[in-house]
């Protein structure tokens, strides 16, 4: 298992999920109002990733038409319950490599807490490793070369 700043079940214990705000965002997207909010479609993928200009435009079109959909809201409503189900299954004893961000970029956690939770999780795995990255949550937009290199090293050691 290779996790790019993945959310382990313990994150959801204290995560505050604002469903009314998501429903408001859904309405704003449906009505097209979301397009009037400056910079809202300027995600890390657009600002820092490797997308071409054409791909950035496609990203924005998809973002505006598929933001806060009913499916996304339903998934969010179920996420804590689903995390508890996963937690009850226990930590898998498989080779796991976690890339851990600094928690910035919308996680809702401070750096220390964001890093502490997956480090505690991976410490329960016999063949578990982690790499801390000094970048926001969407690590693949910032550290894709490091991630690629370290994944290759990890896989070749298995």
List each model region and its residues:
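Short, solvent-exposed loop/turn segments at secondary-structure junctions
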Residues: 7-9, 102-105, 136-138
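Flexible "cap/lid" loop of the alpha/beta hydrolase fold
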Residues: 2-32
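Helix-loop "lid/cap" segments that line or gate small-molecule binding pockets
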Residues: 40-51, 56
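Catalytic active-site module of serine/aspartate enzymes centered on a nucleophile-bearing elbow/loop
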Residues: 123-158
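Short glycine-/acidic-enriched loop or helix-start segments at secondary-structure transitions
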Residues: 12-13, 18, 108-110, 142
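Phosphate/oxyanion-binding loops and surfaces in catalytic or ligand/nucleic-acid-binding neighborhoods
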Residues: 10, 79-82, 154
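Active-site microenvironments that recognize anionic phosphate/pyrophosphate groups
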Residues: 36
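Conserved serine/cysteine hydrolase catalytic core
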Residues: 51-131
């Amino acid at each position: 298992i290779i996790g790019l700043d993945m959310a382990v079940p313990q994150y959801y214990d204290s995560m505050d999920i604002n469903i009314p705000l998501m429903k408001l965002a859904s309405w704003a997207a449906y009505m097209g109002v979301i397009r009037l909010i400056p910079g809202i479609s300027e995600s890390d993928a657009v600002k820092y990733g490797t997308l071409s200009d054409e791909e950035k435009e496609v990203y924005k079109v998809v973002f505006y038409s598929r933001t806060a959909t009913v499916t996304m809201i339903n998934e969010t409503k179920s996420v804590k319950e689903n995390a508890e189900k996963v937690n009850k299954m226990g930590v898998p004893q498989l080779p796991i490599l976690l890339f851990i961000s600094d928690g910035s970029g919308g996680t809702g956690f401070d750096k220390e807490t964001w890093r502490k939770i997956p480090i505690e999780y991976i410490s329960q795995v016999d063949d578990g490793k982690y790499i801390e990255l000094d970048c926001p949550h969407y690590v693949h937009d910032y550290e894709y070369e490091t991630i690629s290199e370290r994944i290759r090293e990890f896989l070749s050691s298995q």
